[in-house]
């Protein structure tokens, strides 16, 4: 006999339900046979925590199981593809579900409806989970991966938070390739969240972290709004208890020898202190959670204070206006056409940069157009001599178009080719914007060159960067701020990374990097949180002549003041009491500085001013004053019930001052723009037949800033316009005021309408004078402004009908507007007359009445019931109001 060593084979662990019942498990996933038999939906197989999941291949991801085929994930066209490995912190939840058990409705583009016979959830974590779902229908977002849903509308469960797909693949909404597999949208459900997050991505760990920080900031705002709601409820409860105690303890106070009058005085002081603690800065937050849903697909921008979207969610009238727009689009079922990315895909396939012939480049660099442009004035780190020397030495002779492989080139040549590319694009933009003389046959190739060179440089380790590389990054970020061509502008701060990583001894380069970083963020109202505001701009040595570098030297003190103001606004704890004195003090300093600067340069015949800074300051002043206006207006409505007439008068006066500051700074903006950037003299001479625009070639530097700020000011002007217009159709507001106030409001209403029509004429003229080449981003921006004004005027014409016929009366019916929210009705007649005269001053400056009558734009769809929105023009409408 032979002794045979027998080894007992350990069976794999069963599911949790079979372990409990101590019965055999067939290990069928996602639900084993026993659990199906006993109708146990919480069947799952726990895996060890911290398990690293295998990374799928770059070509796609295949899954095999019951009824599962292969799913392919589109990886995009990025050059730098790196795997972002993320280890799971929780046991991996098995969420493999048969694709054939789901139904997909392609007509719904914002959400997908998934149906299954029985839902299940993972109860293996130690965190608090949501109640068990027994419904047969599970709703999930198109980018969602969670099966567990919380019954609470305010607080998500821990499983929900764990299953939020915050990785860049979901946040950036990478395109899926629907041509390979009609069920490719199941890629996030057929695997667990960790597998999906570990897919090959063309992005770096730093980019992923930045996106996740933005996500967490939004979650923080949600938590803060919940805290605000809780604090308000507690304060109301405490106020009720205080009133009850005062009534119940009157006898007790008398026994203690307290006189009623003295006691009443003490109670009044306590009440006043309690009210002062309720002075939240609500103009910067959204107190109504439902507002985020009511104006879809508009997205809130809590990290960008100076944008249209930010004020639309926080102003009562703009918010209702967008609700009506949403109703119109929802009723008519308009759809946005998909973008065409064929050219971008074609360029990214070849890693070669192509340039015009050497002779053309040298002729361009020595041309009179480049000398007249005086590029060193706004780009002080540019050196034309070194660039010409590089072209002579590196480019082959002949009439052929040279090409270079970005993979084989050293870093020094890459950066020089990048600087040359940006210079040619700058010169092309300056020539083609109005003069129509540019040779734009190579523009697409140059844009492709810039993308490829930047992508190749990002693959190089930061420690190998030299000063020329940093200079190229700075020049590229400057060109990016002009936003002429690039639809996919980078939001990363590569220039700031260079500032923090290197000790840059070149003064011009050092301050140019800081100036560009700050200007880029301040235009949108972003705080420079990565570098303290006090350290953003260092003093200029006395040995350097500031007149030689106007782009860097101008308004350093005002830049520091603006940085402090934006940082305070970004850091306002709106759920706690806030003192507005510091905000108003910085705002006053910035306003006085801009006023002095404008007066100085308006009297200077040789204007060498970098006007982008001043436009940026004015944008900050107008937005901050509008926040204060909305804040004081909301405080006034609360004061009707809880405060004395003195407080109401005080808030009304503050609103009047804020509104006058808004209008005055808008006037300064139009004066600067149409005197120095786009001279309006030719527009005023329409009546004489002289309709030529006199360009100096530098308008392209300011086109993007002008368009962005103009759109903001149009939205704010329309908010004031609606406050005046409300008396035309709402009897409630009309009865709140007397006849004299109503007359003044109608005068302001007509004058704002006149201003909007004049701006429409001017912008239309500027657009027509530009090159008809649609590739210019600034021209598209001018079209957005025209569409904004056009649909606003149509809405004003038909607003009364919209107020009566709205389907959702609780949301969009203007006849049910919140009471006492229109502070203009509380202004004295003298103050309203001052506002009217200020608007009249702007209107008279823009254009004469005779010119308006000759150049008026006739809108055939002015009386249209749905604002003239059709399938053909819906893309333009959507781009103007929602992008």
From Swiss-Prot:
The modification Phosphoserine is found at residue 150. One of its GO terms (cellular component) is nucleus. Residues 252-270 have a biased composition (Basic and acidic residues). It comes from the Eukaryota. Residues 130-149, 241-251 have a biased composition (Polar residues). It is found in: Nucleus. GO terms for molecular function: DNA-binding transcription factor activity, RNA polymerase II-specific; sequence-specific DNA binding; zinc ion binding. Residues 121-157, 241-273 are annotated as: Disordered. GO terms for biological process: chromatin remodeling; double-strand break repair via nonhomologous end joining; nucleosome disassembly; positive regulation of transcription by RNA polymerase II; regulation of DNA-templated transcription; transcription elongation by RNA polymerase II. Pfam families: Zn_clus. Keywords: Chromatin regulator, DNA-binding, Metal-binding, Nucleus, Phosphoprotein, Transcription, Transcription regulation, Zinc. Residues 14-45 bind DNA. Forms a heteromer with RSC3. Interacts with NPL6. Component of the two forms of the RSC complex composed of at least either RSC1 or RSC2, and ARP7, ARP9, LDB7, NPL6, RSC3, RSC30, RSC4, RSC58, RSC6, RSC8, RSC9, SFH1, STH1, HTL1 and probably RTT102. The complexes interact with histone and histone variant components of centromeric chromatin. Component of a fungal-specific module (HTL1-LDB7-NPL6-RSC3-RSC30) within the RSC complex. Component of the chromatin structure-remodeling complex (RSC), which is involved in transcription regulation and nucleosome positioning. RSC is responsible for the transfer of a histone octamer from a nucleosome core particle to naked DNA. The reaction requires ATP and involves an activated RSC-nucleosome intermediate. Remodeling reaction also involves DNA translocation, DNA twist and conformational change. This is Chromatin structure-remodeling complex protein RSC30. It comes from Saccharomyces cerevisiae (strain ATCC 204508 / S288c) (Baker's yeast).
């Amino acid at each position: 006999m032979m002794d045979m060593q027998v080894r007992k084979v350990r069976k794999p662990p069963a599911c949790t339900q079979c372990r409990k019942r101590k019965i055999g498990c067939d290990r069928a996933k996602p639900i084993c046979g026993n659990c199906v038999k006993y109708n146990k939906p919480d069947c799952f197989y726990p895996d060890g925590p911290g398990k690293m999941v295998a990374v799928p291949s770059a070509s796609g991801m295949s899954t095999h199981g019951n009824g599962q085929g292969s799913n392919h994930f589109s990886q995009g066209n990025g050059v730098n593809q790196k795997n972002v490995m993320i280890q799971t912190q929780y046991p991996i939840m098995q969420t493999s579900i048969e694709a054939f058990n789901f139904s997909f409705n392609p007509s719904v583009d914002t959400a997908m409806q998934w149906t299954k016979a029985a839902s299940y959830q993972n109860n293996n974590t130690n965190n608090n989970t949501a109640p068990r779902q027994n419904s047969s229908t599970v709703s999930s977002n198109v980018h969602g991966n969670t099966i567990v849903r919380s019954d609470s509308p305010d607080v998500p469960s821990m499983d929900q938070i764990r299953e939020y797909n915050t990785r860049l693949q979901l946040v950036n909404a990478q395109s899926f390739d629907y041509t390979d597999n009609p069920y490719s949208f199941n890629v996030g459900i057929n695997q667990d969240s960790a597998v999906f997050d570990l897919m090959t991505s063309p992005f770096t760990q730093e980019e992923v972290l930045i996106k996740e920080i933005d996500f967490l900031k939004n979650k923080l705002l949600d938590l803060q709004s919940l805290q605000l709601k809780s604090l308000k409820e507690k304060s109301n409860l405490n106020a009720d208890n205080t009133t009850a105690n005062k009534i119940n303890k009157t006898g007790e106070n008398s026994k203690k020898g307290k006189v009623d009058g003295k006691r009443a005085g003490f109670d009044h002081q306590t009440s006043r202190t309690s009210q002062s603690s309720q002075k939240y800065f609500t103009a910067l937050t959204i107190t109504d959670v439902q507002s985020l849903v009511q104006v879809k697909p508009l997205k809130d921008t809590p990290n960008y204070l100076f944008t249209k979207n930010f004020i639309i969610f926080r102003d009562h009238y703009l918010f209702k206006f967008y609700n009506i727009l949403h109703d119109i689009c929802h009723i008519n079922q308009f759809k946005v056409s998909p973008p065409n990315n064929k050219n971008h895909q074609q360029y990214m396939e070849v890693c070669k940069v192509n340039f015009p012939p050497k002779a053309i480049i040298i002729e361009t660099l020595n041309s009179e157009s480049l000398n007249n442009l005086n590029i060193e004035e706004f780009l002080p780190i540019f050196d034309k001599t070194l660039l010409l020397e590089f072209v002579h030495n590196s480019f082959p002779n002949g009439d052929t178009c040279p090409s270079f492989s970005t993979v084989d080139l050293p870093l020094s040549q890459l950066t020089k080719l990048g600087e040359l590319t940006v210079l040619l694009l700058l010169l092309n933009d300056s020539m083609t914007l109005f003069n129509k003389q540019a040779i734009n046959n190579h523009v697409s190739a140059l844009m492709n060159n810039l993308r490829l060179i930047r992508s190749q440089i990002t693959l190089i380790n930061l420690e190998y960067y030299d000063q020329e590389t940093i200079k190229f990054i700075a020049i590229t970020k400057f060109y990016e701020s002009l936003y002429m061509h690039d639809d996919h502008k980078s939001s990363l701060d590569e220039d700031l990374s260079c500032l923090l990583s290197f000790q840059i001894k070149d003064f011009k380069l050092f301050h140019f990097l800081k100036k560009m970083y700050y200007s880029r963020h301040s235009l949108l109202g972003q705080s420079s949180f990565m570098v303290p505001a006090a350290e953003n701009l260092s003093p200029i040595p006395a040995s350097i002549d500031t007149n030689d570098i106007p782009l860097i030297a101008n308004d350093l003190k005002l830049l520091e003041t603006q940085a402090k103001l934006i940082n305070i606004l970004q850091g306002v704890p709106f759920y706690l009491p806030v003192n507005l004195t510091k905000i108003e003090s910085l705002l006053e300093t910035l306003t006085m500085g801009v006023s002095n600067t404008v007066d100085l340069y308006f009297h200077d015949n040789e204007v060498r001013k970098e006007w982008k800074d001043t436009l940026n300051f004015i944008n900050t002043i107008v937005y901050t004053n509008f926040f204060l206006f909305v804040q004081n207006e909301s405080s006034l409505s609360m004061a009707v019930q809880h405060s004395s007439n003195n407080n109401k008068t005080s808030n009304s006066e503050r609103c009047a001052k804020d509104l006058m500051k808004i209008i005055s700074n808008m006037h300064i903006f139009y004066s600067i723009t149409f005197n120095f950037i786009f001279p309006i003299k030719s527009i005023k001479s329409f009546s004489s037949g002289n309709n030529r625009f006199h360009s100096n070639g530098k308008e392209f530097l300011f086109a993007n800033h002008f368009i962005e700020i103009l759109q903001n000011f149009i939205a704010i002007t329309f908010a004031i316009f609606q406050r005046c217009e409300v008396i035309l159709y709402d009897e409630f507001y009309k009865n709140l005021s007397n006849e004299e106030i109503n007359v003044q409001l109608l005068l302001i209403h007509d004058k704002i309408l006149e201003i909007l029509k004049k701006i429409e004429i001017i912008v239309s003229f500027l657009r027509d004078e530009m090159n008809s080449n649609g590739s210019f981003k600034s021209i598209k921006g001018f079209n957005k402004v025209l569409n904004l004004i056009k649909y606003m005027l149509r809405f004003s014409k038909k607003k009364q009908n919209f107020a009566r016929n709205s389907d959702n009366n609780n949301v969009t019916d203007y006849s049910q507007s919140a009471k006492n929210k229109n502070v203009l009705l509380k202004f004295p007649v003298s103050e309203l007359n001052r506002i009217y005269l200020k608007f009249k001053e702007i209107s008279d400056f823009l254009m004469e009445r005779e010119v308006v009558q000759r150049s008026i734009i006739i809108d055939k769809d002015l009386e249209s019931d749905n604002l003239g929105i059709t399938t053909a023009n819906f893309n333009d409408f959507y781009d103007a109001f929602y992008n």
